[in-house]
Amino acid sequence: MRTARRWVGLLLTLALALSVAACTRPADPGGEEPQRVLNIGDNLEPEGLDMITVSGAGTAYVLLYNVYETLLKLNSEGETIPLLAQGWTRSDDLLTYTFTLDPKAKFASGAPVSADAVVASFERARGEKATNQIRSAWAPVDTITATDAKTVVVTLSRPSHQWLYELTGPAGIVTDPAYTGDFSTESAGSGPYEFSSWDQGSLVQLKANEAYWGTPARFDEVNFRYYADPNAMNAALLSGQLDLITNLTLPQTISEFSDTSRFSVHEGVTNGEVVLGFNHENEALSKLEVRQAINYAIDRKALVKATWAGRGELIGSMVPPTDPWFEDLSNTYPFDQEKAKELLKEAGYEKGLTLRLRVPALAYGPSIGRFLVAQLAEVGITLELDTLQFADWLDFVFTKRDYDMTIVAHVEPRDMRTFALDDYYWNYHNEAYRKLLEEADTGTDEEQIAKLKEAARLLADDAAADWLFLLPNITVASAKISGVQDNRVSLAFDLTTLASRD
């Protein structure tokens, strides 16, 4: 597998059981007349506007499916459905994919979404300016060809379950080839919305694409408003300044929205593994006994209760329950402080160990950090807690790897392969794990599931990290907003399902 210099982890495998795939488009949630403006509260601002060249889940959250479209997309159940492609076929040898584009599809400029546009977009995603995460998604691809105006043929150098799934995310976005400006300041997509403006630190504004080729945008304007203080975000929804909070980051406040005449609360699942990550180049953390000791020393049930109001599922490895290869591995390291102390003694740290814990200033980071400081102190581990703004976390932790331990929610779908990347920020190298992922990607559907289960168990046994819990999806909306989805299983906050009851 290719190495990666920088990655915020995306997408792994999709079991393919099709030779021809064609589905209907997402249903219109209703015929309501759209209100003029939709105000959305969130806490994770984009790091930039170009999904091909910047890392950070906040960018795709706003732009994917809304401004930029893909040949295929994920619906709220995690199923792959057509978007710009009407359908696709796969050859018997699993090496050739043929996509037929929707003849109605066009960019906001009015230009048609042509096969040449798709080829140019995919080649850009394979180029040197793309993040290594994006380029790695295209590693199995040999050639990309436009055989006519509406047909794209992609050949692979090896079979890959992962590759088609990648097309549903940022690696698969299609951009207008006629655009010669700066993707970091303007948009050139085919989605129902266009980028309008960005007041950094406060607001990203989208406007309706009046020339949209599909179901028209139901809002003239969408404002993603960003709050560092979750209490302030809650207050904005309660006072009517917001129409929706994408994910309630103070679950203990859910009772504030119990008036069903004013609000609707939607609880579902995410891909967001809250990971206590280890820098495996740290001398102490390079030792299995130390990593296992930390896993034994943490009472994850108590952590979820104390920091996330008991809402959060224990998983035990880098696999959410929505993936076909999920196994509950949460009891691999039951809470056992005496066992933790024994392992630390074996590793040579009987007299104590000091580590830096650097966390992002997101809702979960500081509170979980404080919990861990107190709990690990009970087994002789001193944590020096350092809270960073998310941009600084990306710089110091994710890019420069200046940390010992960190906490972050990896929200990307099917992101097991982050642990197989040579140059990822937690510096984990395990050839047996890498081989299992390669065998899963090129094997049969049954082999894929079996190999990925084995890989997840290997990660857990090796204590490659401590998977604290899986974030729930708790979306709270004004009662006048319909079409709110329970689950968040892609990187997008898909506006196409939302409408106003007014």
Regions from the language model: what does each represent?
Residues 475-502:
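Long beta-strand-rich cores associated with HINT superfamily self-processing modules
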Residues 93-96, 100, 135-177, 197:
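Surface-exposed binding/hinge segments that line
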Residues 181, 210-255, 382:
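Ligand-site clamp/hinge motif
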Residues 114-121, 149-155, 191-192, 219-221, ...:
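Alpha-helical secondary-structure segments
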Residues 41-92, 123, 188-189:
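N-terminal lobe/hinge region of extracytoplasmic solute-binding protein
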